[in-house]
Amino acid sequence: MNNKRVFHFPKLENDLIPRVFNRQPVERVPVWLMRQAGRCDPEYRRLREEDGRSLEDVFRDVDFSIRISLLPRRFGVDAIIMFQDILTPLEPMGAGFQFKPGPVLEHPITSLDSVHQLKIPEPARDLKSVGRILNGLKTELEGSLPLLGFAGAPVTLALFMIAGKSPNPKVSEILDFMDDHPGFTKSLLDKLTSVTIDYLNYQIESGANVVQLFESFAESMSKPFYEKWALPCHERIFRNLNRDVPSILFAKEFSDLELMASSGAAALSVGNVVDLSEAIQQFPELIFQGNVDNRIIAEGDLDKISDATLNCLKQSGGKNHILNLSHGLLENTSLESVLHFINTSHSF
């Protein structure tokens, strides 16, 4: 990646993340959290309980999604990420999931015929609620904070589609199935990659300042599988996104940084299996996001949270770094712990 590449952002009151991406000095490391709008927030739980609808209905409700997305603003985060599900683009493909309460697909995608029947959506027509959410967030934020969009990576989406539900605990079996059926797998991943490119570019057109690709089961992939199936999708996606907008690759707990770095993403969101100081030294052209262990935020006392946060910041030395977790906030995380994590980072 070209060290001199410049990303274009609108004028923002809080421009820490834009400055990190453009290699400009920052007074502190910016921070946001995956799943920052969610169950660890009592206000989120109250709103969901009062509303009473299923998640699929909530995700379609533009005003409600905007309201939920903005809740973490009061935490002191340096970015807002759209409240939405990674499975959202699958419905207009003909593979819509219902939440019962977990995601369920009535007819799993397990044959080449079922792949051929999947449609390629037109985002401005078929996913316009996502565009309206991002437009609404941009209006509400009034240039105060950067806005993040996101999508599930093709292999992650394929795992859900083949399983017809959350692929846990059978991820390894499904990955073996994909490897054993290369014609089926290539056809499905090619189609999902095209959909993801269109979906993320639509999010950028609708107001996203940064986009993140979630490869949520990367820790279960062998390096040969990742290189054969996941990486070509990542490369094609990042190659075809708007080059003015930075992209982040999150490959959950995957440790081969060379493979991740070859994706073409501007930033890598890494887990606590990665030594941040070594990563930044090895890949000075990249931004790194992470990598405080989310289990410490969920289960550790405040002193442990402080230690983990400060250790992470010391590893990066405040250079080429956006502070985040190893992956998403766990359900049993207290709001007190989240706020302590953020406030500790502000004091560094």
Sequence positions of predicted segments:
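Intrinsic-disorder/low-complexity, polar/charged segments
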Residues: 61, 111-114, 169-170, 300-301
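Short glycine/proline- and acidic residue-enriched helix-loop micro-motifs
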Residues: 51-54, 112-122, 175-185
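Glycine-rich, aromatic-flanked loop segments that form ligand/cofactor-binding clefts
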Residues: 20-36, 77-104, 125-169
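N-terminal basic, low-complexity leaders that serve as flexible interaction/assembly modules and, when applicable
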Residues: 1-95, 99, 236, 336-348
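Glycine-rich, proline-tolerant flexible connector loops at the mouths of alpha/beta enzymes
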Residues: 81-101, 105-123, 207-226, 326-328
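Active-site loop segments of alpha/beta catalytic cores
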Residues: 126-348
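Generic, ordered loop/turn and secondary-structure boundary motif
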Residues: 22, 32-35, 41, 45-48, ...
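Iron-associated oxidoreductase/ferritin-like identity signal
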Residues: 9-10, 61, 116, 132, ...
